[in-house]
């Protein structure tokens, strides 16, 4: 039930009984009136609507609210709200009153404008960062789409890079040139060269291994045991300095003479 209480300043304050009366009674029971009643110089009743929200230890809060909005308007607003909404309403009024006293022209609008400007700036920065990131992602996706993937694609890539499927790996120990090989009686140069190894191209039946050695070696050609052979290297044998061919373990016993 609401009742009107005249204030010393001539304004009328409406006091409504609500569930917050217990909190107001606890404040008033200590003998110290709430900040609103103390400022208005009146006795704080147990059902005072201001007591739960304007404690006596923070009088400046009610002073600012009363100066900007007026005590009667605040009382009317609190009476129209539910008890669980009053605390948020009082805090909003106190903040807005404080900002209005700091900036009489703009008040809270000035702070809101600054925050909105900062928000727009951050949104623009975020959009630019997303645009730059999308460019890098598009470039990475294009590179991944053009790169060969899988064993078959890798084989095609190697086949295109090396026509006719030839895979030659030559390691030369010393910087020198090999003499030309001509016919069945090819003659190497007399100078001492380093060891040279050449891996010929792969055949369907296995992986042939060819070695070319100059320093007291010769020429050997055969198949490794990985191809399912007998284990011993078979082939044409060794080609020394003289132009003779000697059969290997798997070859025949024929020897071409020097006149061939």
UniProtKB/Swiss-Prot annotation:
Signal peptide positions on this chain: none
Keywords, sorted A to Z: Developmental protein, Nucleus
Expression sites (tissue/organ): Expressed in leaves, leaf primordia, immature ears, immature tassels, whole ovules, silk and husk leaves. Found on the adaxial side of organs.
UniProt xrefs under InterPro entries: LOB (IPR004883)
Gene Ontology cellular component list: nucleus
Residue span(s) of domain LOB: 32-133
Additional information: Might be partially redundant with the IAL genes.
Subunit structure as annotated in this protein's UniProt entry: Interacts with RS2.
General function of this protein: Promotes the switch from proliferation to differentiation in the embryo sac. Negative regulator of cell proliferation in the adaxial side of leaves. Regulates the formation of a symmetric lamina and the establishment of venation. Interacts directly with RS2 (rough sheath 2) to repress some knox homeobox genes.
Protein name: LOB domain-containing protein 6
């Amino acid at each position: 039930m609401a009742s009107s209480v005249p204030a010393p300043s001539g304004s009328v304050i409406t006091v409504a009984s609500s569930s917050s009366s217990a909190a107001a009674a606890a404040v008033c029971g200590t003998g110290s009136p709430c900040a609103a009643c103390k400022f208005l110089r009146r006795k704080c009743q147990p059902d005072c609507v201001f007591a739960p929200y304007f404690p006596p230890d923070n009088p400046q809060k009610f002073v600012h609210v009363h100066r900007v909005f007026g005590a009667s308007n605040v009382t009317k607003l609190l009476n129209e709200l539910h008890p669980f909404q009053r605390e948020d309403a009082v805090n909003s009024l106190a903040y807005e009153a404080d900002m209005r006293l700091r900036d009489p022209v703009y008040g809270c609008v000035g702070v809101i404008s600054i925050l909105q400007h900062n928000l727009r700036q951050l949104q623009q920065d975020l959009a630019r960062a997303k645009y730059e990131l999308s460019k890098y992602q598009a470039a990475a996706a294009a590179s991944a789409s053009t790169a060969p993937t899988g064993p078959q694609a890798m084989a095609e890539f190697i086949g295109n890079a090396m026509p006719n499927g030839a895979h030659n790996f030559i390691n030369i120990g010393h910087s020198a040139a090999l003499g030309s090989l001509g016919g069945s009686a090819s003659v190497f140069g007399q100078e001492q060269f380093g060891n040279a190894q050449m891996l010929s191209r792969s055949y369907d039946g296995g992986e042939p291994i060819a070695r070319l050695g100059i320093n007291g070696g010769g020429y050997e050609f055969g198949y490794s045991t990985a191809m399912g052979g007998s284990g011993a290297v078979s082939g044409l044998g060794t080609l020394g300095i003289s132009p003779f061919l000697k059969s290997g373990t798997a070859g025949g016993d024929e020897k071409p003479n020097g006149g061939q």
